[in-house]
Regions:
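Basic- and hydrophobic-enriched, low-structure N-terminal and domain-boundary segments
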Residues: 1-142, 146-151, 193, 484-485, ...
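A broad, low-specificity signal for short, low-complexity segments enriched in glycine/proline
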Residues: 93-101, 112, 116-126, 146-147, ...
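P-loop NTPase motor domains
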Residues: 130-423, 438, 442, 498, ...
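Short secondary-structure boundary/capping segments
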Residues: 176-177, 200-203, 441-445, 469-474, ...
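Short loop or secondary-structure boundary microenvironments that flank
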Residues: 357, 361, 401, 429, ...
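Conserved ATP-driven motor cores of ASCE-family P-loop NTPases powering translocation/secretion/packaging/pilus
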Residues: 415-517
Length: 598
């Protein structure tokens, strides 16, 4: 802005040379008459401003005037002060809601992402040159679900991936989405017998995908804040898991590629501490594979794992079994035996994928972590290799309870590249401290990658301070009063200006629950009402508008099984895994079905 002002001043100075020369030529004929002649002749010359007569003094007069003009400009520049009246201590102020909304909205209401009651932003990012990555922070009861998540689900304008504690969003908006033509899929970790199945093995395209799966699994099953002084056991356990997965990936039939089969193989790898020469059925399985293909990647990892003593091998197996112990449950084994989710389809047609997790138990959240990672991989791959870099259907991740699910360490880098592929996220947190705890070093990068930040209110002091600093300082006028007593007493008033935060941390804490503070990159902050869900045109199809609640059905699945005898004759057979088609069942039949497969 300073450079622009300097260029404007220079242009005015150059243009000013023209009237200076013109006036000098008017004065030149009277120069020889002295000062009195000039004073008498100039008014007459001004009556005929374009009757310019060249004379012997014309050049001299022009030079004198130009020299004087130049000296005047020089004096002005040397004494010029850089004033910003009314902005001495800061220029922060609230943005104009209507103007900002017009700048970013799409005229058609349903084509937008809803931020506040009067501000929405188009998913056409090439129009406004902002991404639609959003951080939403609000304490318990501030309306993260009611004022942000639900209204955007009701827009029905993208594919959705929704982390849904308690299943509230699914129940309230599922019927609406089906009425709008969506395929609704549910990964239900609360009532697994009602869930669609999710098998991570289906989405393993190459060796790198296997490595990512194992790395993410170990990270997601590591308790928060725990640190191992000796990473050997986890490293060795990951080598064993890689060997088992690579074997299934390349040697087993498709229906046997799942975590229940991994558990069966692990149980078949008996280790006898008193007999180092003992060969388990699993040892024989890999020995046969080595005879067939010594360079097989599964063999390499198994030999690396198997290089220790029997006691060490048993400890490694126990370490891995502890990581995978949830897959011993028949409900989770059934859920992961096959796959119904078809993750790539979210980028090709409108699909709503809900991941239901208990709000008071994080035991199964590792599966959602794996789901997130594979979704990003699948959608990015689909965009790059099939659709020229942009998905035909935008995919919106509504990450409620963001802090409860482990994400890749390079999540900040994933954020920076998803925009161009028509993928966006809404990170929903209770306070800023949660983000700092998850990404101690990258949290600022994550905040910086999101062009929208919506604050709904809360009680965490660090968040109050952060929001106050983002709002900036304004310059305000103040006055002070003085009083002198005595025989000659008087009053005095002094006027001055000073700086003040647009909102102090205390004022941020006291934010009215009806209002939200919105930041959009490159715009003044906005103070606006939270979105009133009852005014949405589709509210009649939700439970908030007395519409039907959505009830997803029960899925009947057989748990994968494998029998490894000492001889291993036939190794893996097609009969070792029974997978039946599922059907939606009534609640009355549910208990009978569960008992049948126990």
């Amino acid at each position: 802005m300073k450079n622009d002002d300097e260029q404007s001043s220079l242009m005015v100075a150059v243009i000013g040379i023209i009237p200076v020369i013109w006036f000098a030529l008017l004065v030149a004929p009277y120069l020889s008459s002295g000062l009195m002649g000039i004073l008498d002749g100039v008014p007459e010359a001004m009556n005929h401003p374009f009757s310019i007569r060249l004379c012997g003094d014309s050049v001299k007069t022009v030079l004198i005037f130009l020299l004087s003009y130049g000296m005047g400009i020089g004096i002005y520049i040397s004494t010029k002060k850089h004033y910003r009246r009314g902005e001495e201590h800061g220029s922060a102020k609230w943005g104009n809601v209507k103007k900002i909304n017009r700048r970013y909205r799409e005229k058609r209401f349903t084509k937008n992402k809803l931020l506040t009651m009067h501000v929405r932003i188009s998913y056409n990012m090439r129009k406004h040159l902002r991404n639609v990555l959003t951080v939403v922070i609000g304490g318990s009861g501030s309306g993260k679900t009611r004022f942000f998540a639900k209204p955007n689900l009701m827009q029905a304008n993208t594919s959705f991936v929704v982390l849904d504690p308690k299943g509230e969003n699914l129940r309230d908006t599922g019927y609406l989405l089906e009425e709008k033509g969506y395929e609704v899929r549910v990964l239900d970790l609360i009532n697994m017998e009602k869930s669609h199945c999710y098998n991570p093995f289906v989405y393993l395209k190459d060796d790198n995908d296997v490595q990512r799966l194992v790395t993410n699994l170990f990270k997601a099953t590591t308790p928060k804040g725990s640190q191992s002084n000796d990473p050997f056991w986890d490293t060795a356990a990951s080598m064993l898991l890689l060997a088992l997965i690579f074997y299934l990936q390349y040697e087993a039939p498709e229906e046997e590629q799942n975590f229940p089969m991994v558990m069966e193989m692990l149980r078949a790898g008996e280790v006898r501490e008193d007999d180092d020469q003992y060969q388990s059925p699993l040892d024989e399985l890999f020995e046969r594979l080595e005879m067939k293909n010594p360079e097989h990647i599964a063999v390499k990892y198994y030999k690396d794992y198997h290089s220790g003593s029997a006691k060490t091998l048993k400890s490694i197996q126990i370490t891995l079994a502890a990581r995978l112990e949830k897959f011993n449950l028949s409900s989770l084994a059934a859920l992961t035996a096959t796959d119904d989710l078809d993750l790539p389809s979210l980028g090709e047609r409108k699909v709503a994928l809900f991941a239901l997790i208990p709000d008071n138990d994080t035991s199964y959240n590792f599966l959602v972590s794996i789901l997130y990672t594979q979704l990003f991989q699948q959608l990015f791959y689909l965009a790059d290799h099939k659709y020229g870099g942009r998905l035909p259907v935008h995919v919106h991740f509504l990450m409620d309870e963001f802090a409860n699910v482990s994400l890749p360490d390079d999540f900040d880098k994933i954020l920076s590249v998803m925009r161009s592929r028509e993928v966006s996220v809404s990170i929903i947190l209770q306070n800023l401290a949660q983000l700092k705890a998850l990404f101690e070093k990258q949290w600022e990068s994550i905040m910086g990658n999101c062009d929208e930040f919506l604050y709904l209110g809360g009680n965490e002091q660090g968040t109050h301070k952060y929001v106050s600093e983002l709002l900036g300082k304004a310059t305000i006028d103040t006055n002070t009063y003085g009083k002198l007593t005595g025989h000659s007493g008087n009053y005095s008033t002094n006027y001055q200006n000073t700086g003040r935060e647009l909102m102090t941390p205390d004022e941020v804490r006291m934010l009215d629950n009806r209002y939200a503070i919105l930041f959009i990159r490159g715009e003044r902050p906005i103070l606006d009402e939270k979105f009133d869900i009852l005014k949405h045109p589709n509210v009649g199809l939700t439970t908030d508008g007395n519409g039907k609640p959505y009830l997803h059905g029960a899925v009947d699945r057989a748990v994968a099984s494998i029998s490894l005898g000492d001889s291993l004759e036939g190794e893996f057979t097609d009969d070792s895994l029974e997978v039946e088609d599922y059907e939606l069942l009534s609640d009355e039949d549910l208990e009978e079905i569960i008992q049948k497969y126990q």
